[in-house]
C-alpha cells in the first residue's frame, strides 16, 4: 500500500506516518514546515520519502508525487484564529487553494481515496454539546471559514469525480 500524507511533519501527521510505516505502507510526506518539524520524523526518516513543498503553490512537478498512490491523508493546513484574522489570504491559500490542488492531483492520478482533516470550528460557538454534524454552520473567523470551504471541496469532488473521500 502506498500512502501520501500532507502535513506529515506536524504532530498528528507524524504520528500517522509512523503508524502507516509500522503497517508496512510506503509513505510519501509533503510538508512545508510552516507548523511541522522534520525532527518529528527522525525515528522513521530512512523509511519514508519526504518532499518539502507548499501545497498552495502547485508546479509541474507536484503531480508526480501522487503517481501510484492508494490513499491520500490531507492534514496540511494553517490552524490558528488570531493569525487568520490578521492575514486571511494566507489561510485561504493554504486551506482552500492547497486543498483544491491536492484534489486536482488526486483526480489526475486517479486516486479514489482521500481523508481530509476538517475542523469543528466551522460550527462556530455551538448551541449545545456534543455538537452534531447536523448543527448550523456558523464560522466565526477566517480560519474556520477556510476549513469549511476545504471540506466542501472534498465533498464536492467525491460526488462529481466519484472519489471515496472522508472528512474527519
Task: Show where each model-derived region lies.
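N-terminal Rossmann-like NAD(P)+-binding domain of SDR-like oxidoreductases, especially those catalyzing
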Residues: 1-168
